[in-house]
Curated annotation (Swiss-Prot):
Family of this protein: Belongs to the PsaI family.
GO cellular component assignments: chloroplast thylakoid membrane; photosystem I
Cell compartments where the protein resides: Plastid, Chloroplast thylakoid membrane
Alphabetical list of HAMAP family matching this protein: PSI_PsaI (MF_00431)
Entry protein name: Photosystem I reaction center subunit VIII
Main location: plastid
The organism of origin for this protein: Picea abies
GO biological process: photosynthesis
Amino acid sequence: MIIPNLPSFFVPLVGLLLPAITMVIFHLYIQNDDIF
């Protein structure tokens, strides 16, 4: 019962979390480039 429910919860979580992590890494890269 857990296996079919897991992707239903995991896919939207990754869909929201992945762009957030990408934005954070991009912001840190811009900030680091600005310091240099």
